[in-house]
Design a protein with these regions (language model features):
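Catalytic domains that recognize anionic headgroups
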Residues: 1-181
């Protein structure tokens, strides 16, 4: 089951059940036409329950394509109540912001991703008595925040700075999964 909160899967998920969550309407998880990443956890049990039984019996792989820390609109990726690094850059025109504002806005997205991952792990923990569960988190790219006058990401790998190439990898295993040989 592919859940997408970014710009769609661009055909990658065409052969599997998929849901685009970024355009949903939810009073606390969406604002101004965009949804925050925890929307992917909303109604997740029902989405899995709607899969064919034969497919569920084999096990379910969930792919959650986050909006995460994608710029330049870092300020839109985090609900106001979760913003702890201020002042933050509140425009898409990154050159109009100080380095401190830009880093604060980006750091808010990282902290909110931590919150989202904690929620995802909590969801998995609730199911670990009946299922062996695992979470693997990996980012698709790093991000430049003005170092050497570079912003965002997307340079060819051969010339991209390390901050665009080095990404986090986080793994969480349920007790049952960890005990497997």
């Amino acid at each position: 089951l592919w859940l997408d909160n970014q710009a769609g899967c661009k055909g990658t998920c065409a052969r599997v059940p998929n849901v685009e969550t970024g355009n949903l309407k939810h009073p606390t998880l969406c604002s101004a036409g965009e949804c925050w990443d925890p929307i992917m956890l909303d109604s997740l049990d029902a989405r899995i329950g709607a899969l064919p039984a034969a497919q569920r019996d084999k096990g379910v792989l969930l792919v959650m394509h986050q909006m995460g820390s994608h710029g330049p609109a870092y300020h839109k990726r985090v609900p106001q109540a979760f913003k702890r690094f201020m002042p933050e850059c509140s425009t898409n025109n990154l050159q109009d912001c100080s380095r401190e504002q830009l880093v604060n806005a980006y750091d808010n997205t990282i902290a909110y991703t931590d919150h989202f991952l904690a929620q995802a792990i909590g969801w998995l923990q609730q199911r670990q008595t009946s299922h062996d569960t695992v979470m693997v988190y990996v980012s698709d790219h790093g991000e430049s925040l003005g170092e050497n006058n570079l912003y965002l990401h997307g340079l060819p790998y051969a010339i991209a700075p390390d901050v665009q190439k080095h990404v986090p990898w986080i793994t969480w295993l349920s007790h049952g999964f960890a005990q497997r040989q």
